[in-house]
């Protein structure tokens, strides 16, 4: 895949190479293997100490003795919230800047360093434009209706039938769908299948149960609410 650059190939080339191997059946349990054993224990301890710890803690793998199962991971999705060149969205007064925004400069491929334009150039433009505009605008108070709507959604989740499925299953299926159809390789058919699946998951999400009914630092509720936002973003 990169006979000249070898292990120094760009993340773009490496990601496509890994996914091609997996898709064509040469992977192992949905991964390819990264072997560091030839470097020797001393080099691994001195120069790859963080990777040594992460592989041990999260994958249960000792990279001094066995290869690491790897696969392409989502850093961030190229093409986010649609904005103009000043970071202004379709919602008056709402800006999006940096890696969450899409100014339509780049395509869908996440190449090294192209986030600098998003963050440094358009991030600054957004800040300057927002600073200028805020001097000309008055601010409205948050309406009771907006707060009531959010509270009603929280109460609905807390009251859902305990027989409903847990948020983790829906979240896992969402991740698998996005990884399969909207990651390294994309086509129209796959994206249409993903959209249909996301809409199915949104319907199932309405019946998701929150096991912890507490109202203080309820992480179960927080993760469930986050899943709703993830489904909206995915759609």
PLM region spans:
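Short beta-alpha connecting loops at secondary-structure transitions
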Residues: 2-4, 105-116, 153-159, 179-183
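An active-site-proximal "capping" alpha-helix that borders the catalytic cofactor pocket
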Residues: 115-133
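Short, glycine-/Ser/Thr-/acidic-enriched flexible segments
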Residues: 39-41, 75, 86-88, 101-103
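FAD/FMN-dependent oxidoreductases across multiple families
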Residues: 49-95
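An anion/pyrophosphate-binding glycine-rich loop and adjacent beta-alpha core
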Residues: 1-62, 66, 129-135, 171
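C-terminal amphipathic alpha-helical interaction region
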Residues: 204-235
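Long, amphipathic alpha-helical stalk/connector segments used for oligomerization, subunit docking
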Residues: 132-215
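Short FAD-binding loop at a beta-strand-to-alpha-helix junction that anchors the flavin cofactor
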Residues: 88-110
């Amino acid at each position: 895949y990169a006979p000249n650059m070898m292990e120094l190939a760009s993340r773009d080339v490496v990601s496509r190479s890994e996914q091609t191997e997996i898709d064509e059946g040469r992977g192992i349990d949905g991964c390819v293997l990264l072997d560091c054993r030839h470097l020797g224990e001393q080099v691994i301890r001195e120069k790859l100490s963080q990777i040594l710890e992460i592989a041990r803690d999260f994958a249960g793998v000792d990279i001094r003795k066995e290869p690491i199962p790897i696969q392409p991971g989502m850093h961030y999705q190229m093409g986010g919230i649609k904005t103009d060149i000043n970071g202004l969205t379709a919602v008056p007064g709402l800006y999006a800047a940096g890696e969450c925004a899409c100014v339509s400069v780049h395509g869908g491929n996440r190449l090294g360093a192209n986030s600098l334009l998003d963050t440094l150039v358009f991030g600054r433009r957004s800040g300057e434009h927002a600073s200028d505009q805020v001097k000309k605008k008055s601010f409205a108070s948050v309406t009771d209706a907006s707060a009531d709507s959010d509270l009603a959604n929280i109460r609905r989740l807390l009251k859902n039938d305990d027989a409903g499925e847990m948020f983790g299953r829906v979240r896992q299926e969402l991740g698998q769908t996005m990884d399969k159809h909207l990651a390294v390789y994309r086509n129209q058919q796959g994206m249409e299948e993903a959209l249909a699946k996301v809409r199915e998951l949104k319907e199932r999400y309405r019946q998701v149960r929150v096991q912890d009914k507490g109202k203080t630092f309820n992480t179960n509720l927080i993760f469930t609410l986050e899943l709703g936002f993830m489904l909206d973003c995915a759609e």
